[in-house]
Amino acid sequence: MNRILFAGLSSGSGKTAVTCACLRALQKKGISAASFKCGPDYIDPMFHQRVLGIPGENLDLFFADAKTLQRQIACYEQRCKIAVLEGVMGYYDGLGGVSDRDSTWDVACATNTPVILVVRPKGASLTIAAQVRGMLSFRKRNQLAGILLNGCSESMARLLAPMLEEQTGLPVVGFLPYVEDASFESRHLGLVTAQEVGALSEKVDRLADAFLQHVDLEQVLRIAATADSVAETVKSEAALKSPDCPDSPQFPAPDKQCLRIGIAQDTAFCFYYEENKRALRQQGLELVEFSPMEDKKLPEGICGLYLGGGYPELHAGKLSENSGMRHAIFEAVRHGMPTIAECGGFLYLQKELEDPDGQIWEMTGVLDGRGFRTNRLQRFGYAVMTAKENSMLFEKGESIPVHEFHYWDCTQNGTAFEMKKPVGNRTWEGSVAGNSLYAGFPHLYFLAEPRLAERFARAAAKWQEKQREKAL
């Protein structure tokens, strides 16, 4: 499958804007594309999803191995002509900021994807060539295949392009100028969600028009066509009829009746890995969306709950005022309905939650803690989570890679797991786990351990059977 990866010298290079512009430009040209985000960020794929109209996915080597990433890409070969990957942070920045492991470069090598380096030439010219040459020589295998100038005027691009090509040997595929009123706003969790960006479609259209005018799309496609083929063994393992890959070994096709799972989906709860949703569907689970902010009761006939991350702290007042939903969730969890609550969902299960103005609001009360605001990220980044006891999703001693990204903390974070940073010796306890509940700040990634989805489905089936027995 043809593919291209947009990477940067650092965060703030404009990778997201360039990636979205490219995706929409491809769409305008009638070229079907799949989108992927390097690393654990679940916000950028939401932008990709809005642009493409199909789900975006993550490619993360801390969560999964190279073969799994290749399989993810292979799943889209029948439907799409090209995969567009967006990098994370600086190109070589990996674990702990001191390693290239799990970096954008690592993903590029693992997936054999050519890379276009997005460079913002602000206050520099020849120095950019020195930086790029350093990038080229830093690792023997670098995957770098081109340069795109971002936030650059046409006159500056005409000056820089020939110099950069001469000094680096890489082609400059074009430039993306500053497009007025087409920037993405900021929020404490990186970027605002796709649902909240004002006139996102119009913004991306303007970026795409600029991309088509100033970037040589044909050259980008030629570079993408140099990508090495995904191994035939990987292709054969992936079900290429659908991006859901139902026959993939990662998601064994279950022979089960469909069970309904309520999944919180609104502006307060919207952070989910598409791969997690797919894993649950592969286990015979129908994901039924509901809004903890707007709906007064849970969906009918559900056998489990999935409360994802998001911004409940920004909507604490409205969540609190919806007492019908708060009570419904309290009763469901109290009576043993299988429940997964991650980050924002974990805060919603607490007794109280502080909003950005310092006001305290009543939440569901499933747990006895209070969520409160801090002035910096808490336990940010990757960790390895090891179960201290058996529970719905885990057996004692099992470990799984996870990720945390949150400014809010909690008075009671749980003690069911031993947490450890992959770099350094920092450890702590976290998350709550029981026979029918997982709740904690860490985001789970089901590709890292497919048995999590299997066990959740098994718990949902047992719950349904129990309810049927009660009804007899």
Describe each PLM feature range.
Residues 108, 269-281, 286-288, 373, ...:
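C-terminal and late-domain segments of enzyme folds
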Residues 249, 259-323, 327-332:
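Phosphate-binding active sites in nucleotide-utilizing proteins
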Residues 2-17, 23-111, 119-146, 151-159:
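ATP-dependent carboxylate-amine ligase catalytic core
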Residues 37, 172-180, 286-294:
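Beta-strand->loop->alpha-helix junctions that form or flank phosphate-binding loops
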Residues 195-240, 244-255, 265-269, 430, ...:
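Acyltransferase
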Residues 312-391:
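Cysteine-nucleophile active-site neighborhood
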Residues 125-243:
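Internal gly/pro-rich beta-alpha loop/helix module
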